[in-house]
Each structure stands twice: as C-alpha cells, then as structure tokens.
Amino acid sequence: DERAKELLECLWVKFYNQPAPVKVGITLKESATYTDFANINTGGVTPDGRDGVNAVSYLILDCMDEMKLVQPNSNVTISKKTPARFLKRACEISRKGWGQPAFYNTEAQTMELINAGKSLEDARRGGSSGCVETGAWGSEAYILTGYLNIPKVFQLTLYNGFDKESGKQLGLK
C-alpha cells in the first residue's frame, strides 16, 4: 500500500507541474487561479453497475489529503452503493476547507449521459471532467485544456510525422 500511495503521489506532482500557458486577458481577469482541468475521479459504479470503490479509491483519498494540491482536481462520485466508510473519509478531507474533493452524484451523471445518447454502460464509465462537465470516457474525445496544438498536428500529418522545427521524427511515418 505504501509503494502504491507513493506512486500516486508522484502522479499528483506530475499533474501539478504540468506546463500550462500563462493566463492572460479575460482568463487572467476572471479566473487566474483556476486549475487546468485535469480530473481524478474515484468511486461511482463499474460499467455493469456494481460499486466502484476499491482499495485504490482509499489510496486516492489519502493522496488527496496528504498532497493538498489544487491540481489535479480531485473528485469523488457518490452512488447509492457507495460504502459509508468511503463517503465518511471523503467528508473528513472536505471539511478541512481546502476545496477538495468535489462531490458528484453518480446517478445524476449517468442519467445526463443517457439523455445525451450514451449507452448505460458508457454512461456508467463516465464522470466529471473539465470544470464540472460530464463526459463518457472511452466513447468521446475530451480535450478541455485548450493546449492541443492543431497546426502542429496538421504539420506532422503533412510531413509524415517529421517536425521541421526540431528536425526530429515525432509522429508516425
């Protein structure tokens, strides 16, 4: 458990150190302190509807509590099947007042995704992403940070993965 927790904490540090463009203009004025939309969701249900809380879920809660980093956004997804012990631990962390974890309702998210045309299995596989959006992971693209360099993708496509700026082969031939 300690080794797994250490690896999770290293992941938290990687997320926190993600290079992001400096916020300028209206973004700086209105939301200079927002995170860059990386979300860790834990809890919820499995695609077949069983409780999704497991040993890693508790390690993630411990990581949230010990690291106290604003990124990644740390979320717990609560369903009717969520163990009371898990919910209590998440509430203990939340009451410390540093803004995490966020709490989401599994059933509400699932219904939102079904209403958007997703299958029940895909809807159960989804969760929160971005600010507070709900997405069905694995069945749709979610690029919320705005840091996808589409012109670079186009350039690499045109030149068979070769990057003319660096002189390196970065993509597929």
What are these regions (language model features)?
Residues 1-173:
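Conserved catalytic cores of very large enzyme subunits
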